[in-house]
């Protein structure tokens, strides 16, 4: 039988390649006569390293170049960290598969001199590195005595900056640390009570052409239904709020007794205003769960906070 050839578009960062190689390996294991190749490239978000992510904007910052490859027929699928994939995709493309989720939580990584501290016991003025406005707003809300500083670069670069003494600690996604073999550097998993994670964090999203039935059938072998239900609810929540991955919006989701539990948070940039609530709904209608939670937060003033943030972005 003739091999079916499938080309994957991927970012060329170490983490992206680890994730893409995992997808390649799993597809080839599960689909007989499948030949998978990878086209690695840099995205805008990979190239601009001297500006805070929030100031660049986030419309396809880490995805646009990969999507262009699919739209011109140079790639069949693109593998993304789902948290980087915008909730509104270009015409002709769709989120075809969501893989089983790694731990979605944020993690504290500390310098050697600070390994006796947890996040809640760090001395006043400690320098905490994060590039995420979501983490920044929540941690400012809980720990206003700490000094937060922007940090850019890939996971390895950030750890090197920490070890060089630029920061006392940094906050990273636990999933990325584990996938890159840095699990031993996880000093503390940050509880949801302190910091809700990003939408889709810990899961991989496989994007493809909307009308490519053969490719959709192939990638469906990697679909994890519970992860998909949770992440679709999270993404619907984010979409309904018209937020992006660089806005202070956090979530947590779980499935209990055939019900989908979704907690969501919106905060001001300074962390002084933080709105958090939960919605419990039908596991088979995750989109509705996300929309209903967004409505609850809007009624409490979330849309006012977000419009102020967008106005600040426009001014800057």
Curated annotation (Swiss-Prot):
Keyword Repeat included in the entry's annotation: no
Assigned keywords, A-Z: Chlorophyll biosynthesis, Porphyrin biosynthesis, Transferase
Known EC number: 2.5.1.61
EC class of the enzyme, as a word: transferase
Main function: Tetrapolymerization of the monopyrrole PBG into the hydroxymethylbilane pre-uroporphyrinogen in several discrete steps.
Pathway: Porphyrin-containing compound metabolism; protoporphyrin-IX biosynthesis; coproporphyrinogen-III from 5-aminolevulinate: step 2/4; Porphyrin-containing compound metabolism; chlorophyll biosynthesis
GO aspect biological process, one term: chlorophyll biosynthetic process
Annotated signal sequence range: none
Positions of disulphide bridges: none
Taxonomic source organism: Prochlorococcus marinus (strain MIT 9312)
Annotated positions of the S-(dipyrrolylmethanemethyl)cysteine modification: 245
PANTHER family assigned to the protein according to its UniProt record, in alphabetical order: PORPHOBILINOGEN DEAMINASE (PTHR11557:SF0)
Name listed for the protein in its UniProt record: Porphobilinogen deaminase
């Amino acid at each position: 039988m003739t091999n079916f050839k499938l080309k994957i578009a991927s970012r060329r960062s170490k983490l992206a390649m680890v994730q893409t190689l995992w997808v390649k390996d799993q597809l080839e294991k599960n689909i007989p006569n499948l030949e998978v190749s990878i086209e690695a490239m840099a995205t805008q978000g990979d190239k601009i390293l001297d500006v805070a992510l929030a100031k660049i904007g986030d419309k396809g910052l880490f995805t646009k170049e990969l999507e262009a490859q699919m739209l011109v027929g140079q790639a069949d699928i693109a593998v993304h960290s789902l948290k980087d994939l915008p909730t509104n995709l270009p015409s002709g493309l769709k989120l075809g598969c969501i893989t089983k989720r790694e731990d979605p939580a944020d993690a504290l990584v500390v310098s050697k001199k600070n390994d006796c501290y947890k996040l809640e016991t760090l001395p006043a003025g400690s320098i905490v590195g994060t590039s995420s406005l979501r983490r920044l707003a929540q941690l400012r809300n809980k720990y206003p005595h700490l000094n937060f500083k922007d940090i850019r670069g890939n996971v390895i670069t950030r750890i090197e900056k920490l070890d060089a003494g630029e920061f006392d600690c940094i906050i990273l996604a636990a999933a990325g640390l584990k996938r890159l073999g840095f699990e031993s550097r996880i000093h503390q998993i940050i509880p949801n009570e302190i910091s809700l994670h990003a939408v889709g964090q810990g899961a991989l999203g496989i994007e493809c052409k909307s009308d490519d039935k053969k490719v959709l059938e192939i990638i469906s072998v990697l679909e994890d239904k519970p992860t998909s239900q949770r992440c679709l609810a999270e993404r619907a929540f984010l979409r309904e709020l018209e937020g992006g991955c660089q806005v202070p919006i956090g979530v947590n989701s779980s499935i209990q007794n055939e019900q989908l539990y979704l907690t969501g948070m919106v905060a001001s940039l300074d962390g002084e205003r933080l709105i958090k609530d939960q919605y419990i709904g039908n596991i088979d209608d995750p989109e509705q769960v996300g929309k209903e939670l967004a409505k609850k937060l809007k009624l409490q003033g979330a849309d006012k906070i977000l419009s102020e943030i967008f106005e600040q972005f426009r001014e800057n």
